Amino acid sequence: MTSLRKLERDFAHADAAAVAGLLAQLGDEDIMARFGLEARLADLQQEIARLDAAGDEPTASAALFFGGRPVLGQRGIESEFAGTVITKFQDIVAKVLARETNGLGQRGVVANKAASTLHITNIVRGSFGFLLEEAGLQQHMVETPLRAAVDEATRLLDAFGEPDEEQFRTAIETIDDRLLATARDFFDIMRSNGATLRLVSGGTDRSFGTEAVERAAERATSTTVQDSEEVLRGQLGGVLPD
């Protein structure tokens, strides 16, 4: 299920629960109000069933909800903080995509960065959040490389906040220096601004409270990457001409 569909389903469930609560408070004399609320509840239940039955979208999407010091409830968010932290998330996605496709060099321009571009397509309720989606006119039948990269970036960030140390170490076994450095920047921005985060992408729905942000920032700072040489033995079968 995409981030948008999951959020729509969550909101529909919340609205249905609120309507059911109002119905429970009505007396027998509130006939017209009951008719209206029952019709609204039926519509919400149909919407939930539609969202549950919908297939998974092959394109990338992620929703980032922020709370804490930079946020004024659902009214607004500090623009400098929002721009900086969203840019860092985009950088993580770009580096994951490069690593999984053309390879991520130790320095220099990130390969195929344009292909990793996400667009802010909506402001979503629930504290203050942004919906980021893969844009394009082409229809896709199978999962796009960017969808896989966004899901992997989300899994990686999730690992830094994971309470279990062993699960964290297992999840970051293949991380490289450039990706680690960008994750470090991301969580440093979160911590220094006193921000919290809920990150929704694919099947992941992860909340980073103050404690989780602190843990993630400390791990990103203290973790180091150690390279090792590996010898692979084989036989050259031939060389293709240029």
Language model region names:
Residues 1-209:
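Protein-protein interaction interfaces in oligomeric scaffolds
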Residues 192-194, 239-242:
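A short, compositionally biased
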Residues 208-229:
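Short boundary/loop segments of OB/S1/cold-shock single-stranded nucleic-acid-binding domains
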Residues 226-241:
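Structural detector for short beta-strands of small beta-barrel domains
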